[in-house]
């Protein structure tokens, strides 16, 4: 694995661990950043369908249509 790939993997792991920690305290956080595509992503939202509520992370880009059973 190249150095860049290793750093990317380490960063992804760190973000996942931190989001899991935050998820146990809060229902979720909203992140936004600007770039070629302005994106808003909710991280750490609990998946109520999952038996592993505090362990599973849902990454959902806002603006995509949600299934009717998962609307807030």
Swiss-Prot record:
Keywords for this protein: Amidation, Cleavage on pair of basic residues, G-protein coupled receptor impairing toxin, Neurotoxin, Secreted, Signal, Toxin
Which residues does this entry assign to the site Key residue for high activating potency against MRGPRX1 receptors?
43
Task: Report, as the record phrases it, the tissue specificity of this protein.
Answer: Expressed by the venom duct.
Q: Where in the cell is it found?
A: Secreted
Secreted: present as a keyword of the record?
A: yes
Major subcellular site: secreted
Q: Which residues carry this modification: Isoleucine amide?
A: 43
Which residues are the propeptide, according to the record?
20-25, 44-72
Instruction: Tell me the segments the record calls region Positively charged region crucial for activity against MRGPRX1 receptors.
Output: 32-39
A Gene Ontology CC term for this entry? extracellular region
- Membrane-crossing residue ranges in chain numbering: none
According to the UniProt entry, its GO molecular function terms are: toxin activity
Q: Which residues form the signal peptide?
A: 1-19
Is Signal included in the keywords of this UniProt record? yes
Q: What is this protein's function per UniProt?
A: This peptide activates human sensory neuron-specific G-protein coupled receptors MRGPRX1, but not mouse receptors (EC(50)=0.54 uM). Compared with the agonist chloroquine (anti-malaria drug), it is 600-fold more potent. In vivo, induces itch sensation, since intradermal cheek injection into humanized transgenic mouse (mouse MRGPRX1 replaced by human MRGPRX1) induces scratching.
Other facts = The mature peptide does not contain cysteine residue.
Q: Which family does it belong to?
A: Belongs to the FARP (FMRFamide related peptide) family.
- Name of the protein in its database record: Conorfamide-Tx2
**Native species of this protein?**
Conus textile (Cloth-of-gold cone)
């Amino acid at each position: 694995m190249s150095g860049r790939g290793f750093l990317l993997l380490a960063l992804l792991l760190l973000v996942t661990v931190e989001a899991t920690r935050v998820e146990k305290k809060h229902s979720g956080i909203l992140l936004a950043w600007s770039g070629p595509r302005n994106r808003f992503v909710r991280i750490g939202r609990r998946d109520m369908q999952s038996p592993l509520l505090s362990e599973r992370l849902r990454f959902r880009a806002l603006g995509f249509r949600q299934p009717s059973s998962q609307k807030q």
